[in-house]
Amino acid sequence: MSLLIPPKLIVLGDSGVLGWGDPEEGGWCERLRRHWMGLPQGPVLYPLGVRGDGLERVAARLQAEVSCRGELRRQRPQGILLAVGLNDTARVGRSDGRPQLDPEAFLFGLQQLLHQAQQLAPVLVLGLSPVDEAVMPYADVLWYGLEQVRRYEALLEEACLEADVPFLPLLESLLADPAWLQWLSPDGLHLNSEGHRQVFERVKRWPALLRWANLQPLGAPSLSV
């Protein structure tokens, strides 16, 4: 009997991927990993989030993260999910200071990253979560704002459309709920447990991700006979 090997997805990103702010269940990515573990032939998920990472640092570790997680000899993961960009939106020193990575450099770097990642495996990209401007600055030096977050998420979408990469916008979906501020940690930047649950529920039902995973959409009728 041949061994059925489930597909492997690596998720590259920042503290959101790490699950910071969710002591209950370890974040949206960990929730997805556990959810898939409970499914027959569910994909294997590697959450690879590093606190503080922006686009450039994620790009710098792309090759190494992919190359060592094939599990079997000469194998690679079958998918890459990028969840990055929020840290790049922060303005340094004051509310109108320079961004950590200016929009033009962000877009160019993202285009390069998508091209490199597509040479390794199918790629998907996740949008950005909201921030609470009223409690800024973060760590007394970084100013996050909704206008900046909205601008950078639009750049994510632009690059994904150009590269024909599936993209799941998050910002407006989360902001549409009147309770969205209650989904943030006191620092105004990181999602709390409920915020991570909200993102998990959206990612879990993402049609592009379900197609990649060869999983039947939730609520869809069974095709078995």
Model feature map: region roles:
Residues A59-V225:
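Alpha-helical cap/lid subdomain in secreted, periplasmic
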Residues M1-R51, E56-R57, Q63-Q75, I80:
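Serine-esterase "nucleophile elbow" of acetyl-processing enzymes
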